[in-house]
UniProtKB/Swiss-Prot annotation:
Purpose: Probably serves a role in the transport of a small ligand released during the hydrolysis of milk fat.
Cellular component terms per the entry's GO annotation: extracellular space
Name of protein: Late lactation protein B
GO molecular function terms noted in the UniProt entry: small molecule binding
Gene symbol of the encoding locus: LLPB
């Protein structure tokens, strides 16, 4: 259960860490769905979540991000909150004392983002890329841009996963 939790948390943390601090008109903030995900880590391949709940991202006044999502493991709903600290590099945030970094790239499709996470987990280097969007509807143009990004970062395109979307559960302690 801890491995599954870590898998989901790392997977979703990378979603949360991304806002370009440049003068972009759009901000990475609001509710997003993971539309596609790819990794080169066997650990994540074996433990990838089959369904993901929406992610709510809030831009904090100091430039950091806070993200919230829920996970339902063995019938128990839990809300996860994470804080991601901005770095001196535009578009890059860190977490876990800097052991993980996420780069965010805006696609040409409104409100669609590509997140690229690199870091260490259990002594292994892990790379994950995700396509996020505000709705569960497919967007072929955004997906094509994601595939191009995946290819440029030398991921195996055949390992792109389209996760099932699930509703946010309500934790008992709320």
């Amino acid at each position: 259960m801890k491995v599954l939790f870590l898998t989901i948390a790392l997977s979703l943390f990378s979603i949360l860490q991304a806002q370009d601090s440049s003068s972009s008109e759009e901000q990475f903030e609001g509710t997003y769905f993971v539309k596609a995900i790819v990794t080169d880590s066997e650990f994540f391949e074996k433990n990838k979540p089959k369904a993901l709940s929406p992610l709510t991202v809030t831009h904090l006044s100091n430039g950091d991000l806070e993200a919230k999502f829920t996970t339902n493991m063995n019938g128990i709903c839990e809300e996860i909150k994470m804080k991601f600290e901005k770095t001196d590099k535009p578009g890059i945030f860190s977490t876990n004392d800097g052991s993980r970094q996420v780069l965010i790239e805006k696609t040409s499709v409104r409100d669609h983002w590509i997140l690229f996470c690199e870091g260490e987990l259990h002594g292994m280097q892990v790379r994950i890329a995700k396509l996020l969007g505000p709705h569960t509807d497919e967007n072929p143009k955004a997906f094509q841009e994601f595939k191009k990004f995946v290819s440029l970062k030398r991921f195996n395109e055949e390992k792109i996963n389209i996760p099932r979307q699930t509703e946010t559960c309500i934790p008992e302690h709320v």
